[in-house]
From Swiss-Prot, chain A:
Its EC number is 7.1.1.-. It is a peripheral membrane protein. GO terms for cellular component: plasma membrane. NDH-1 is composed of 14 different subunits. Subunits NuoB, C, D, E, F, and G constitute the peripheral sector of the complex. Keywords: Cell inner membrane, Cell membrane, Membrane, NAD, Quinone, Translocase, Transport. It is found in: Cell inner membrane. Disulfide bonds: none annotated. The gene is nuoD. NDH-1 shuttles electrons from NADH, via FMN and iron-sulfur (Fe-S) centers, to quinones in the respiratory chain. The immediate electron acceptor for the enzyme in this species is believed to be menaquinone. Couples the redox reaction to proton translocation (for every two electrons transferred, four hydrogen ions are translocated across the cytoplasmic membrane), and thus conserves the redox energy in a proton gradient. This is NADH-quinone oxidoreductase subunit D. The lineage of its organism: Bacteria, Pseudomonadati, Chlorobiota, Chlorobiia, Chlorobiales. It holds the Pfam family Complex1_49kDa.
From Swiss-Prot, chain C:
The keyword Iron applies. SUPFAM superfamilies: HydA/Nqo6-like. It comes from Prosthecochloris aestuarii (strain DSM 271 / SK 413). Keywords: 4Fe-4S, Cell inner membrane, Cell membrane, Iron, Iron-sulfur, Membrane, Metal-binding, NAD, Quinone, Translocase, Transport. This is NADH-quinone oxidoreductase subunit B. It holds the Pfam family Oxidored_q6. It catalyses: a quinone + NADH + 5 H(+)(in) = a quinol + NAD(+) + 4 H(+)(out). It comes from the Bacteria. It is a peripheral membrane protein.
Amino acid sequence: MQELEQAVNRSVRVIPQGEGRVTIEKDLSSEEMILNMGPQHPSTHGVLRLECKTDGEVVTEAEPYLGYLHRCFEKHAEVVDYPGIVPFVDRMDYLAAMNSEFAYCIAVEKLLDVEIPRRVEFMRVIVSELNRIASHLVAIGTYAIDLGAFTPFLFCFRDREHIMSLLEWASGARMLYNYIWIGGASFDFPPGFKERTAEFVNYFRPKALELQRLLTENEIFVKRTKGIGMMPPDVAVNYGWSGPMLRGSGVEWDLRKHDPYSIYPELDFKVCVPDGKHSDIGDSLSRHLVRAYEMVESLSMIEQCLDKMPDANGFDPRSAIAKRIRPKAGEVYGRAENPRGELGFYIVSDGKSTKPVRCKARSSCFVNLSAMKELSMGQLIPDLVAIIGSIDIVLGEVDR
Amino acid sequence: MEESQGTIGQSAVVEASRAAYAIIREKFADAVSEFDANPTMPFFEILDTSRWSEIALFMRDNASLRFTYMACLSGMDYPEDAKLGIVCNLESLGEHGHRIAVKVKCDRDGGAIPSVANVWKTADWHEREAFDMYGMLFTGHPDLRRILCPEDWEGYPLRKDYEVQENYHGIKVPY
Amino acid sequence: MGLLDAKISNHNVLVTSVDNVLNWARLSSLWPMGFGLACCAIEMMATNASNYDLERFGIFPRSSPRQSDLMIVAGTVTMKMAERVIRLYEQMPEPRYVLSMGSCSNCGGPYWKHGYHVLKGVDRIIPVDVYVPGCPPRPEALIGGLMKVQELIRMEQIGISRAEALKKLEEKSFDPGIVLEHQRKSQAVS
C-alpha cells in the first residue's frame, strides 16, 4: 500500500476501501491562467485594470494597473493659480467634490493669514457632511449592484438626488461644485436652505434604517462579504490606509476627531468603529458597516451645525477672500477627512507667485488600492469583486 | 479658531517634532541636517542619502519615535540646484501623535535614492509615481516601473523643463 | 410610435416602409455600452437610475460591446485608454452609434491645454455621431442627446451611408423656437 502511495503523483489520492481494494482519485490538472479584469468592466468602479493570476476560480494574485484616467492634475496645479485649482480638485474625487475642495482650501489657508468667517465655517461643514452622505450612498449602491442587488442601487440614487438638488440650490451645479473657495465660499445659502436641509435630515433617517434592513442585514450580502478581504490593523497602518478602511480594521482614527480642522471640535460625534458582533473586524462587511454608521453620524452633525450656525443678515461669504491669493513662502501638508480616507495636499509656495511651485495630491484611494495585491491572495474571483467594492475606489482620485 | 489658540497648538506640534528629531540626531549625527522648525511643516533633510533606509527603519521601530504611518511621499524638482528629491510626511498614528517631514535629495541625471518600500508599504506606489513623474531611481525597490503614464511614455512629465511629445502610437497628443 | 405611412386596413394589415419599421425597432431599444470613464459616468448612472429613468426609453445599459449598439463615451479618454476605446469600438456590431458625453470626450475638456496624457476629444480616434456638451452634462442634457441619436436613426435608410444620414439630420433639424413662436402668435391672434 505504502509503495503504491509513494509511487503515484501528488495530485492523485489513493483511498483504501478495505478487503484489498482501493479507490484512486485524480484531480483535474490545472495550470495558472492570467486573466484581465478591465479596464472596461462593469464592476471595477471605473477604469481599473486588474491582472489576475488564477488557478481555476482561485486568484493567486491580482495586481492593479493604473493610469487609465491620469489627467495630469499636478501639472495643471503648477500652471493655474491657486483659486483656479479648485475646479480641478473637484474633478479628482468627483463623488466627494465638496470634501476635496475643503481639504485643498484648508491646506492653502495654512499658508495665508486669513480669518475665515464663522458662518462660512458652518456652511463648509454642512455641505461637506451632505456630500459625505451622498458619497457613501454611491459607495453602498454600487457595492450592492456589484454583488447583484439592484434595488439598493435605485434606493441610494433616489436619496442622493435629494442631496444633489440641495447642493445645486446652494452652489449652482449638481456634481462638481466649485463652491468652497480659498478664504470663504462662492455663494451664501439661499433663503429656505436651512429648513429644507432639516427636512432632508428627517426624511433620510428612516431611509438609512430601511437600507440597513434591505442590505446590511440581508443574509446573502452578509455571506458574500463576511470574512472576505481581512486586513489586520498594523498592516493597514503600514500601508497608509485611512478613513473607513482603517476604521473597518478596528483602528479608531478619524481626522475630524484626532487632527481636527474647522469647527469640528465644537461638534459632538463619535468615531464609527465596528464592534465585531455583526462582522469580523477587518473584513469587507466591517468597512461597509463603518460607511453605513457614518451616514447616520453625519446627519446628527448637520443638525448640530444648523442649530449653531450664525444668521445671515446680509453676509457675504467672499468678504475674507483676497483679490490675489499669494501665500507666503513655505510648504505645508494639509489634510482633511474625505469619505474615502485622508486627502492631503503637499503645497510648496515661493511667496512671490500666484501659482504653486508644487501641489501634490495625496489621494486616499491610491493608497487604499495599493494593498489590493495582498488582499486578493487566495480569494475567489467573485470575492475579488466584493473586495474592490469595499475599498470604494474612485479612479479620478487614484490616477489624478 | 482663535489666533492665539492656533499658534499655541502649532508650536506644540513643532516642539513634539523637535523632540522626535533630537532622538534621530543623537543616533545619526551628521547624516541628518539641522531641524527646520517652520510652523507649517517642520522638517529635516537627510544629508547622507545612503543611510536613508537605515534611518527610516530606526524611525519606524524605535519605541519613542514609532513613526508607523507614512502620510505622503512626494517627488520634487529643484531646477536651480539641478537636483531632484522626495519629501516624506510621517506620523506616529495613535501612539505618540508627533509628526515630521523628511527630505532626501539626489542628482538630476541618473540620481538614485534608496527605497523605503520595505519599511512603509505606502512608499511602494508613491516611489513608483515619483519615478514616473521625475525620473529618479529608487535602489532596492521591488518593482520600479511607471505607474500612471504608459510604459513607453517619453520624458518625465512633472519636471519643470518637460516638453510634451507630439505623437503617441500615431495619435496626436497636443490640442 | 412613428409609423408614418402606416395604414391599417380592415384585415389588420399595416402598410409602411421597411426603413420605418427597422428604424423604429432600433431607436426604441437602443442598448448602450455605457463606457463610463470619469465624472460623466456618475451622471450617466444617475440618468439610468430612478429619478431620470432611462429604461422608459428602452435604453438598458449593457456591459459587453458585443451586445450593444450605442457607445456612450462618458468621461476623459486618456492616451493609455485610447487604444482600448478603439478596440471596444471595433468589437461593436453594426449598426453602431457613438455619443460623446461631456467636454472631456468632446474636445479634451478642462485638460485641453496642459493635459499631456489626455486625448483631446474622442473623435480623434473613433467617429462620433452626437456630442453632448457639459461638465458634466445634466441628465436632461444626456436624454436630449440620446433623443438626437434616435432622430438620427430615423433618418437612416437601407443603402445610404452614415454620413448621408447625418447630413439629412442636419437638414431636417429645426429650431423649436420657431414652432413655439408660431404657436404663440396664433394663440395671441385667436
